[in-house]
């Protein structure tokens, strides 16, 4: 039946009335909104937005409705019918049957010696220490296992200032540097470090191992490239890996190999997208005890437009007339090294790490460095200890002369190296890998003897069994019997030395954490407080222990 004219008019009047009613409601809402703080700003925004793009107004209205529904709705949608209700007996049975995964894999029987032979020091770290290994206690032992190269951690002034700081502000910083962890002594220490190193600014970290792992990812990401020394210690290896950039490795301190890699990359880098490019190396190698030619290294990085990250953990306080590291040796300004990182737990006799360089580079880390943002700041007394040691070194500076705090270490390092290098009998068993200026004397089993003992040249590295285990996720269960055996023999040498009141040390590395090939080493860390008589005695004890142990091994194969 056709609709009448009267029905059409009634429908039209109803719709018109509805429209007027909606209009009145809208204006009432607008008036209410105008009375609210910021309401006029919202209304003007809606008018301008609707005028330029009506569809945008509709989209924003829908988003607003969705947001209201989202926040008012229940956070979780649950159906009680799907919940399983267990009786107490069933719950107890499940708990009893549950076997948790171990936090760490249990040690094998032939690995437990590593735990049992860890020396425990009774008292402060100094030239002579009392140590406990297992059930045995040795007193007044000559310490060649400490990285406190200058021997200043027990200096009277350092101890007094540290104690005074503890009494004033307590032991811990109680928070990250970015929040409430930074105190005045931290600021002074940063200034002292920057001034000592000749850098614009400096930043400090609570842990030295966390320093490279936090600094490198601040400046490297996917698509960037870093070329790392092939002898870098594990901290630099991990730092490069977690930054997720492209990594190239050049042969240890082989600058010809470095330049060859850069030359091969140069064409691709010119054509590819603009990215960040760094070279990473150490001022004094932790694994080899030698240094690169910094002058040529700077020339290479400038030629190929790369930046340089130099880890001076071992070279600060040991190299240069005043202990300012490798740049002081080559008379190169610190500004030529874009990023300098290092440890304060070695020559500075304290704890933590630092990064020095350009102010903008330092400021960038304040907001982007994981360790700086999330980890606790360095304990205040540790910062005071570093500042005190720096002041002591600077106060003794005389231009053109070796600093009195540095000279004994240099002389001791050269002397002990000469004793080991000049021994023809000892050279049949071990090879000195470190250079004479290194305060850490590195000894490796001689290549010919390794072959006679059926030991591999190196352990780990690309293509090795441990690398394959790592790819398969079985690295925790991997065991290298030769690596364990060689490390045990070095520990046997150490045990014999401890019986004679000398404490050397050895490399203690976890094989599956190392990306690069490694070789176990016996190490003597030389101290500025050691006397010539100490060094002579240590040489006689260590050399006898080496010859006795390795000769017995060679003859018996056991």
Tell where the protein language model's regions lie, with residue ranges.
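Active-site C-terminal subdomain of aminotransferase-like
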Residues: 304-307, 314, 319-449
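N-terminal "arm"/small-domain region of PLP-dependent enzymes with the aminotransferase-like
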Residues: 2-10, 14-20, 24-172, 306, ...
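Substrate-binding/gating loop at the entrance of the active-site cleft, primarily
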Residues: 207, 228-245
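Active-site phosphate-binding strand-loop segment of PLP-dependent enzymes
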Residues: 148, 248, 253-309
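PLP-dependent enzyme catalytic core of the Aspartate aminotransferase-like
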Residues: 3, 48-56, 60, 64, ...
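Conserved N-terminal alpha-helix of the aminotransferase class I/II PLP-enzyme fold
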Residues: 71, 159-207, 415
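Conserved PLP-anchoring active-site segment centered on the Schiff-base-forming lysine
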Residues: 216-234, 255, 259, 409
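Conserved PLP-binding catalytic core of the aspartate aminotransferase-like
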Residues: 401-417, 425-501, 513-533, 539
